[in-house]
Structure formats: C-alpha cells, structure tokens
Amino acid sequence: AGGSVTTGIQNTLIGGLAGDALTDADYNVAIGYNALSADTLGSTSTAIGISALSVQNFTTATNSFNTAVGYTAGGSVSTGQYNTLIGGSAGDSLTTGASNTAVGYAALATEDAHGQNTAIGSRALYTLNAGADSYNVAVGNDAGYLMTTGTRNTIIGGLAGDAITTGAKNVAVGTSAMSTNILGSRSVAVGDSALATQNSATAVDMYNTAVGHGAGSAVTTGIQNTIVGGLAGDALTDGDANTALGYTAMSAVVTGDG
C-alpha cells in the first residue's frame, strides 16, 4: 500500500495495492485491496472497498472529491470529479461523469461520461446512459430502472417511473406512479399508482397531471388531463383535456374529451 508515495501528505492507505501508484497526492483514503490503486496525482478521494476507484488517475495535481464506498464502487471512474458512490457496484461504469450521487446496490450502474444525476435505492437509474448531463433524480428500489437517455425526471418511490426510457421532464412520486410510461414526457403523477398505465408509443409531451391514490391510473394515451383526488378519473383511458377534482370524480368515464 502506498509504495510509490514520495511527497504526498495525510494519506491513509490500507490493503494490498491500495493507493499503490500515488506519488505526491494528498488527503486520500484508500481502504481495501486495489482501492485507488492507479491514481498518481489526484487528491481528496475516498475509496473504501475492493477495487473502489481502482482506475481513477489524474496525471496533474487535481482535487477529485470523489467518494466511493463498496465493492467496485466507482471502479471505472478515470477523471470524473465530485461523485458520491455508495453501494456494491454503485456507479461502476462511470468514467468521466461528474457530480453524480448513487447510493444503493448497482445504482446508476451503466452511466459513463455524464453527470448531475441522483440515484438512491437498489438499481435506481440502473440503465441510464444519457448523451449529456441529464439532471435526473430517482429515489426508491428500481426507481427509473429502465431509463436510458431520459432527462430532468424526478422519480420517487419503489417502481416509480421504472419503465421510462427516453421520456423527459416527468415527476412521479409514489409506489408504482407512472410505472409503465416509456416515451411520454411532461406529466406529473403524485400518489400510489397515479398514472400507473400512462404509456405513449411515440415520444410526445402528454401534460397529464394526476394527484391522489390511483388518480388517472387507467390513462394510457390520453393527454392534457388534470385529475386530483383519490381514485379520480381512475377509469379514463384515452380521453383528452379532462378535469376531475374530488374523490372518485369522473370515475365512471372511460373515454371522452373535456
């Protein structure tokens, strides 16, 4: 451990090959076999776990502020900075992505070069690999699980938004909220199973708002609906521009436009 350190200060290196290439880098913590083993000049990194941050390597003096805790957590990070990765395999495909937070087993496991994502929960944002900084927030087991290039989505709850692939600017809060939506964008679902079956076969701005337990839970391709109340509009499928306010409001309406 630390076999190459020359003038570096205040490094804590514990484990075979931990911090083994560091020379004059400072303020690093590497605990575990092969943790932070390739970096030479990067400072202010914390790597705890076998092969955590194992390929990170700054060739000029740089404060990385990366934190990786868990087996292979951040194991592919090369020059990405300001990442917090906690959990086995969390963020383990990240290379140059920056300012990501992944907490949970395999959270944000596929994203490589982009940043500004927050994934909290086992396999949250598991398949995300956006083409640019994407500003997604997913909290809950499998939240946003299938998202690939979606951007600016806020997803909170187990299985919430877990079918979204390229949809953007959606808000889904509650277990199974918006759970089958794939391509639809700009919808808000707050409540257990709200907009649970919304699913557009093409990329489209849907502008549905559903607030309440089961609100709009049968909506599939309907757009521009505003549904507020427990079980409100829960039979509506493809109607457009409807407004339902109150418990079970419009609960018998299946189709029809406002």
What are these regions (language model features)?
Residues 1-258:
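Glycine- and small/polar-enriched repetitive beta-structure motifs of secreted/surface proteins
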